[in-house]
A protein has these predicted regions:
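Alpha-helical segment proximal to the catalytic Tyr-Lys
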Residues: 27, 71-75, 132
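Active-site helix of classical SDR
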Residues: 22, 58, 66
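C-terminal substrate-recognition "lid" of short-chain dehydrogenase/reductases
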Residues: 19, 30, 34, 112-141, ...
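Catalytic Tyr-X3-Lys loop
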Residues: 1-19, 34, 38, 55, ...
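Active-site loop immediately N-terminal to the catalytic Tyr-X3-Lys motif
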Residues: 47-53, 75-76, 111, 129
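Active-site loop-to-helix junction immediately N-terminal to the catalytic Tyr of the SDR YXXXK motif
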Residues: 2, 48-56, 68, 96
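Residue(s) in the substrate-gating loop at a strand-loop-helix junction
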Residues: 42
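Substrate-binding pocket helix/loop in short-chain dehydrogenase/reductase
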Residues: 3-8, 93, 100, 104
Length: 147
């Protein structure tokens, strides 16, 4: 069960926060006719996660925000992209047992969990000059778990 307060908090942190940051950053980017906006969703934003409805909804909303902003801000030289990580070894995984992690790795086609560095490397590339023709995309960093 999710309370209305939990629902709203999840949306505020994962969707409204991103919207507010975009609102603050965009005027300067539009003036300069250049910029990169990167959002971080989740594979659950792409597929939905059982017992994760509020998280999945917030992350799916972030994907929608990314795509709409890409269309809106492209003419101003601003690209907007999203990274949707899968099972990544972070503090969010701290409560998982070694057996749970092994089972998740076994479900993943590449046979292991991802690292934060793998997500970060993609974000660095998308923030760079060589990514100027990439916009409105959702990049799964999930070892093939979501294909």
């Amino acid at each position: 069960d999710i309370t209305p307060e939990e629902w709203q908090h999840m949306l505020d942190v994962n969707l409204t926060g991103a919207f507010n940051l975009c609102q603050l950053a965009l005027p300067g980017m539009i003036r300069r006719k250049a910029g990169r906006i990167l959002t971080v969703s989740s594979m659950w934003g792409q597929t939905g996660g059982s017992c994760e409805v509020h998280y999945s909804a917030a992350k799916a909303g972030l994907i929608g925000l990314t795509k709409a902003l890409a269309k809106e801000e492209g003419p101003s030289g601003i690209t907007v992209n999203c990274v949707a990580p899968g099972v990544i070894e972070t503090d969010m995984m701290a409560a998982f047992t070694a057996e749970d992690k092994a089972a998740l790795a076994e479900e993943t086609p590449v046979g292991r969990l991802g690292s934060a560095d793998e997500v970060a490397e993609l974000l660095v590339f998308l923030a760079g000059e060589n990514a100027g023709y990439i916009t409105g995309q959702v990049f799964g960093v999930n070892g093939g778990l979501v294909i």
